[in-house]
Amino acid sequence: MKKQNLNSILLMYINYIINYFNNIHKNQLKKDWIMEYEYMYKFLMNNMTCFIKWDNNKILLLLDMYYNVLYNYHKQRTPMSNKRLMNSKNIMDYKLLYTYFYILNKMKMEMDNYNNNNNNISLKYNELLKNIMNNLNYKTSNIETNLSNNFYLMDKYLINKYMKYLDMLNMIPNNYMFNNINYKGKLNIKTVLDLNNNEFYDYLSGLIEGDGYIGPGGITITNHANDVLNTIFINKRIKNSILVEKWMDTLKDNPYFVNAFSINIKTNLAKEKIFTNIYNKLYSDYKINQINNHIPYYNYLKINNKLPIKNIMDIKNNYWLAGFTAADGSFLSSMYNPKDTLLFKNMRPSYVISQVETRKELIYLIQESFDLSISNVKKVGNRKLKDFKLFTRTTDELMKFIYYFDKFLPLHDNKQFNYIKFRFNTFIKSYNWNNRVFGLVLSEYINNIKIDNYDYYYYNKYINMHNARKPKGYIK
């Protein structure tokens, strides 16, 4: 038997997947042939000549992505029609995140061992590949069972997978050729817990400007449930504060659904610590007036009875915008798919941040600080309620924010990971042709990784470790 190299085996695996899709297509009703299968099947069929020129790492990433879809098919015998495959709001998303890298490492070991072995192996190549598939189906099921019994362990794996993705994507600017981007920067991977005091309070000031309220009783910061890690880290950093779960009243059909978390800062010790550190780090008149209106309630604070003044520091040189974006900003990674072909998919990454009219000066502050056109600020809404939105899409505009967020954005949560996808897709837009096909495939892969809301059961197991308090009137 002629010995094959790893690249040949990987290409055989792609052929095996094509045949697998063919069988699914023949044996399933048309309504079960969902969009993800259609796209992946056509992409494989149309681009085999491109794959032959790829290196092994690219092919392994491609196979990793495709295995995820096949694995979903095995786990969900009835595929979901008219829904994105990875948008299911349950714990399966977390199990799959861990499964990705297990599969990738398993494939590497199996194929490397086979490639380095002698010629006396009796297995044929297609039999080997089928055995790999069967082994993975069995072993990943056991992994999921173990992880589902320990949510904290599962979350730990999730964070580790983030770091691996970050490491992989961090190499993109240095290892790939771009047409019009000259960028040598790298992600500064840290969490809120890693910031020094000055950096943390810059970040906290921005977060309070967006999602905070300063009242006579203290400070309340409310974050969406998707940003639970961010909330927990901030609560841990502040100390002497209370973490409270919140439920949406409108979700009567699911009374256990956690919608948001609040950090309540009410003790005098915590309030003195926060106020003295954010006192002159605010940019909006709205939040400054909240402090001014409640100064009598804080007469015990050592702030010399001076009214706060508006911050005049350059927001490009501190963590304020990172905190403000965590509250009210979004990193989007949409894709434009022309009608004529799947091959020329275009990326449409964008950075969006909005504020109500009473705080529109913050939008103009960002626009001026990053030297953007006034046309980037749009007024949206109806006659009674208007929002001011900053919207950026051109590569030059997006690169200005990438230079900033690479340096100042803490990475540990859903919105921060959306930034990684946004950043990656911005670079994809400027790939030269040799790398563009691979970039588009990898972008599809990265964009399918999402964090959705946990259901109450898993939230409860996780949050109880952090002493979250349930709201008054909660009925178990």
Curated annotation (Swiss-Prot):
Q: Which SUPFAM superfamilies match?
A: Homing endonucleases (SSF55608)
Chief localization:
mitochondrion
PTM comment: the record says: The N-terminus is blocked.
GO BP term (any one): RNA splicing
- What is an example of a Pfam family matching this protein? LAGLIDADG_1
Q: Which UniProt keywords apply?
A: Endonuclease, Hydrolase, Mitochondrion, Nuclease
Which Enzyme Commission number(s) are on file for it? 3.1.21.-
GO MF terms here are: endonuclease activity
Gene Ontology cellular component annotations, sorted alphabetically: endodeoxyribonuclease complex; mitochondrion
Compartments in which it is found: Mitochondrion
- Belongs to which family? Belongs to the LAGLIDADG endonuclease family.
The protein's role, per its UniProt record: Catalytic component of endonuclease SceI (Endo.SceI), which cleaves specifically at multiple sites on mitochondrial DNA and produces double-stranded breaks.
Q: How is the subunit organization of this protein annotated in UniProt? A: Endonuclease SceI (Endo.SceI) is a heterodimer of ENS2 and SSC1.
Protein name as annotated = Endonuclease SceI small subunit
Source organism:
Saccharomyces cerevisiae
